[in-house]
Amino acid sequence: MYVAGVMSGTSLDGIDVALVHIEGSGVGSKVELIHFTTVPFRNDIKNEIQQVLSIKNSNVQLICSLNFKLGLCFAKAVKEVCKEANFSLEQLDLIGSHGQTIYHQPKPEGNMISSTLQIGEPAVIAYETNTTVISNFRTMDMAAGGQGAPLVPYSEIILYRHPTKNRLLQNIGGIGNVTVIPSQKSDQNVIAFDTGPGNMIIDEVCQRLFQLPYDQNGEIAEQGEVVDEILTYCMNHSFLKMNPPKSTGREQFGEEFVSQLLKRYEKHSKENILTTVTMFTASSIVHHYKEFILPYYEIDEVILGGGGSYNDTLVEMIRYGLKDEKCTIFIQEDIGYSSEAKEAIAFAILANETYHRNPSNVPSATGAMQSVVLGNITFPPIR
């Protein structure tokens, strides 16, 4: 099958689309990336997303409208990846659309219940592309008692499981998440969970203090010094003390967190603040390895992916934090995979599994009571 995986993450960089060819289904699937592209959001769309992400500024009218606007954006992005690949849209069998997360509350307080909301109307995508769409991947896992995240472990088992080596896959997107993939000869379980902020705080600080969308290659963070009192404040966040499985998002490490941090430590230089929040991402990752993984698994390789793997300063901080461990650290490109395309490929794989009615959550990662088939299916009109 030819499948387009569509991902719009917490970092709001744009719409990632991976065009892949998948043979078969299940853990024996063969997956080939044909083409990958990122379609940036128009400024007005990005501003509307940022508005609905804010509890203070959001409103139901805007969410309703944006749901359909994003459906059109996602459909346009699918057409773009096909155009760039010289691939006929009519040949496309399936689209897996993650959608844009508006709110995710796996462990809410008060009278709220565990829930999640992604928008980007699948009916609009199906109509515009004349292709079947799989969407809303997180909801069934949450209905089964899971946290709805992380969902990439199933695809990582297919793509990265090694005959003899135990691997850690660390994704560094807006949020960081890790998957432990034991070797094929091991009888240990796959586990996965969010490690805290990835690029989210770094990017927000860059935008506010330097008027830049992100710290390219970590060049600014390389110039500053870590401020111990800021790092201690960050590392005392309650999320780091929780046991896995667990997930997090903009609700805990978004604009409000950054506003409080900058107000509290405004006396420090902006370079030192950026260096310190970069170290926070690295330290939160290393903390979770040493606390929850390395005492129980003998890890041979750590593979870093996602946009954060292009931040050289962040990568070096992670290497330094793991310098006393026996594992070898790679970037995904070192082993022949694209860091940028990882999550889009994952949702293409999950769409293929749903199409074949195969469960594709990993209960040991999400905390769900059972394996379930993920997502909703939206068929195109008959023409």
Curated annotation (Swiss-Prot):
Pathway field? Amino-sugar metabolism; 1,6-anhydro-N-acetylmuramate degradation; Cell wall biogenesis; peptidoglycan recycling
Reaction equations catalysed: 1,6-anhydro-N-acetyl-beta-muramate + ATP + H2O = N-acetyl-D-muramate 6-phosphate + ADP + H(+)
Q: Coiled-coil annotation: which residues? A: none
BP terms from Gene Ontology: 1,6-anhydro-N-acetyl-beta-muramic acid catabolic process; amino sugar metabolic process; peptidoglycan turnover
Q: Which InterPro entries match?
A: Anhydro_N_Ac-Mur_kinase, ATPase_NBD
Annotated EC: 2.7.1.170
Q: Which UniProt keywords apply?
A: ATP-binding, Carbohydrate metabolism, Kinase, Nucleotide-binding, Transferase
Q: Name one GO molecular function term.
A: kinase activity
Record-linked CDD domains: ASKHA_NBD_ANMK (cd24050)
Q: Where does ATP bind?
A: 9-16
Q: Which HAMAP family match?
A: AnhMurNAc_kinase
Task: Tell me the function of this protein.
Answer: Catalyzes the specific phosphorylation of 1,6-anhydro-N-acetylmuramic acid (anhMurNAc) with the simultaneous cleavage of the 1,6-anhydro ring, generating MurNAc-6-P. Is required for the utilization of anhMurNAc either imported from the medium or derived from its own cell wall murein, and thus plays a role in cell wall recycling.
NCBIfam families of this UniProt entry? PRK09585.2-1, PRK09585.3-2
Q: Which family does it belong to?
A: Belongs to the anhydro-N-acetylmuramic acid kinase family.
Q: What is this protein called?
A: Anhydro-N-acetylmuramic acid kinase
Q: Which organism is it from?
A: Bacillus cereus (strain ATCC 10987 / NRS 248)
